[in-house]
């Protein structure tokens, strides 16, 4: 089977599992308020958001309001929920459950506290506790009155999460639910995208010079984000963002994903240590050579979902090995 057709086949299977699982988690909900929208240049977070939008549309659940991470205070979330008393609360999926990123950690704590006596759905996450204190904070927050439905996206995260939520379930990453992507044909054999943040693995390979991460918007997006960021820093201004139409956040995410896909599509083979570069690369029919990140996120996900379905992903033990493997195939 060609890589493009193979990708379409396993993507359809993973998408089906996500939609079915989240359908059970949201139950008979008719509307939702989503918190912890990541207004950040990371393309992976935007792909997750677009996947969430697609699932809500398929389930017939309105997205009534969105609260970005930087606006996720107890006061802002509380006032937003009072505007939508019947809405189910969704917390954005991703790879930040456990305190690895303090802004997302605090947003999740505030969201769980503000949502007492509501149904709260945590979309699929990777779980990595950075400290006992972070784990204890989340344990207490998960005990808030109401119904908490938690999904995690790999078997290792499920084991970690069961201590906090014994009913947690396993679902694929929600980015698999993104609408079909259009990618130009490759213009070179290999395209490299590597992390430059705290999750980056050791990168001794000399061939990495000049290759980049995708943590940078284009100029127009950077200017727009700077304006939003200035408002985020003003307590009185944060509530403004919960009144922004959800479609605005979706357009922001679409621009970021388009930028990421255009970068990845240049190569016939993609070499990366980013989970969503791996996922998006598969979506556009590319072969992927993966290097695990610093906390084992990629291998855990591959072991749980992609390997059993025969996805065209090859793992390398280091960046040096990955580059040698990529060059040997060209």
Whereabouts are the PLM-identified features?
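Active-site anion-handling motifs in enzyme catalytic cores
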Residues: 1-330
């Amino acid at each position: 089977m060609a890589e493009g057709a193979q990708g379409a086949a396993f993507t359809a299977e993973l998408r089906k599992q996500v939609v079915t699982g989240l359908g059970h988690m949201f139950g008979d909900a008719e509307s939702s308020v989503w918190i912890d929208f990541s207004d950040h240049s990371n393309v992976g977070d935007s792909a997750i958001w677009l996947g969430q939008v697609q699932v809500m549309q398929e389930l017939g659940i309105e997205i009534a309001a969105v609260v970005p991470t930087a606006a996720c205070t107890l006061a802002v979330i509380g006032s937003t929920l009072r505007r939508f008393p019947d809405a189910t609360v969704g917390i954005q999926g991703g790879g930040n459950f456990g305190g690895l990123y303090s802004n997302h950690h605090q947003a999740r704590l505030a969201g769980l506290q503000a949502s007492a006596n509501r149904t709260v759905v945590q979309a699929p996450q990777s779980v990595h506790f950075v400290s006992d204190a972070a784990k204890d904070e989340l344990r207490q927050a998960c005990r808030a009155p109401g119904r908490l439905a938690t999904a995690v996206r790999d078997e290792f995260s499920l084991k970690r999460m069961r201590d906090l939520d014994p009913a947690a379930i396993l679902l694929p990453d929600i980015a698999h639910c993104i609408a079909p992507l259009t990618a130009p044909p490759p213009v070179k054999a290999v395209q490299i995208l590597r992390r430059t943040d705290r999750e980056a693995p050791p990168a001794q390979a000399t061939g990495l010079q000049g290759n980049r991460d995708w943590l940078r918007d284009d100029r127009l997006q950077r200017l727009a984000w700077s304006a939003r960021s200035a408002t985020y820093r003003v307590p009185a201004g944060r509530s403004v963002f919960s009144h922004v139409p959800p479609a605005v956040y979706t357009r922001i995410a679409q621009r970021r994903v388009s930028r990421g896909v255009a970068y990845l599509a240049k190569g016939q083979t993609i070499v990366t240590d980013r989970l969503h570069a791996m996922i998006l690369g598969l979506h556009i029919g590319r072969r992927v050579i993966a290097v695990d990140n610093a906390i084992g996120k990629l291998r855990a996900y591959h072991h749980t979902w992609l390997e059993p379905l025969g996805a065209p992903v090859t793992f390398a033990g280091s960046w040096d090995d990955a580059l040698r493997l990529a060059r040997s195939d060209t």
